[in-house]
Amino acid sequence: SWFNLVTLNSGDAEYEARYKVRDERNVVKFTLADDTNSGSMLVSLSMVRENLRTTRDVMPESAWELINELTTFAKQSIKDGCLNRGKRHEFLTQVTNQCQLIQGYIASTLSHDEVWDMWCIGRHLECADMTTRILDAGTHVLATHDDRDEAHAPLIIWGNVLRSSGADHAYRRNVAA
């Protein structure tokens, strides 16, 4: 269900306080565009922008410009209705591509000193946090899964967990080896 996205990000209480219905429209709005949700994409982009603004003296100058452009793009796209089903995939693909561009830019231009170390620690902590959330979600689905539903359900669930964490390619390469 769509609500699993809210649960995955520990936003159940915040969601329930603002929305009565657990449907696609509300979940997408809450997770991407709700400026009162501290974990929404829009709030996260604004926080990254603010963090870069306050650390401009130690971060590459263009990183600030790139995140500023991405934040402006996201806000304008949301105003223009990009959360609708027909436009959402293209919008999220653009956001993902811009995030990867920013990550790559910082990784290739930041001096490898204590600032680099802190940036790497933050990236690794965020990755570990998201990985444990995805694993928790997969484990929960398996624990509540009725064995009579489908014999291959565990394989499908773990395949989805691997894809969600971007680990499916590495898994296939190692299993095939």
Give the residues covered by each predicted segment:
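Alpha-helical transmembrane segments and their helix-helix packing motifs
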Residues: W2-A177
